[in-house]
Amino acid sequence: MTFAILRRHFLLGSLSLLLGSLFMPVFAADLLDEIKSNGTLEVGLEGTYPPFNYQDESGELTGFEVDFANALAEELGVRAEFQPTKWDGILAALESKRLDVVINQVTISEERKQKYDFSTPYTVSGIQALTRKADADSIKRPTDLAGKKVGVGLGTNYEQWLKENVPQADIRTYDDDPTKFQDLAVGRIDVILVDRLAAFEMVEKTGNRLAVAGEAFSRQESGVALRKGNPQLLAAIKDSLKKTF
């Protein structure tokens, strides 16, 4: 799927704290200044998650989020520098300042908003079951996952959702997507939970050997994730999103 298609589809307790908050914007450097000084936006993504970010036949990173990140960087007057990182370490890399932002279908959740700032959503999708074609009719609702071997990304919202909603499922976690898809294809697991948009892409890429099973179980919105304390960068990203979409 192309970029064009997807783009459619406290009170403070003391005066000293109050004064501190008022003067902070004057003295605190914002990450946006550093990004513009360096000329690059360090972007974290997996690089193995089609159609959002993956390597083409020549080994070049491509996909919707690659195009989006390049457009965002251009709006900021810099270039995007991509840092492929496994999902289970990508937010830690953001926290440790190895990355400026993460653009990797990071679902905006209340729990994550306690730790990170998010842009407005750039995709709206859902949690989707993906099975082998012959088994598609066996999964129509969340309760159908009970007792089945369900593959999910380690530390993802899919894993959390499954634990909360279908604890009877046999949860198998993966730190990379290719292995997860391969295990489904050869029958080591019964079903995987993925982004609904990614599910349709995978069906196409596998020559319809896999199938989207039922409707999405839950709505999810994804946004650009960045460290808290960078209001100028956050505002610039939000403004760029308005122009891009």
Where are the model-predicted features located?
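Periplasmic-binding protein-like
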Residues: V124-T131, R196-K242
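N-terminal export leaders
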Residues: R7-L11
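Short helix-initiation/N-cap motifs at beta->coil->alpha
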Residues: V66, F82-A92, D137, R172-V186, ...
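Extracytoplasmic small-molecule ligand-binding "clamshell" domains
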Residues: A29-Q105
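Flexible hinge/capping segments at coil-to-helix
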Residues: R132-K149
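Ligand-binding cleft/hinge of the Venus flytrap
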Residues: N53-E57, A69-V78, P142, G155-Y174, ...
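A ligand-binding cleft/hinge motif common to bilobed small-molecule-binding domains
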Residues: G89, V106-Q114, W161-E164, A185-S218
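Alpha-to-beta junction loops
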Residues: L41-E42, V78-R79, S96-N104, K148-K149, ...
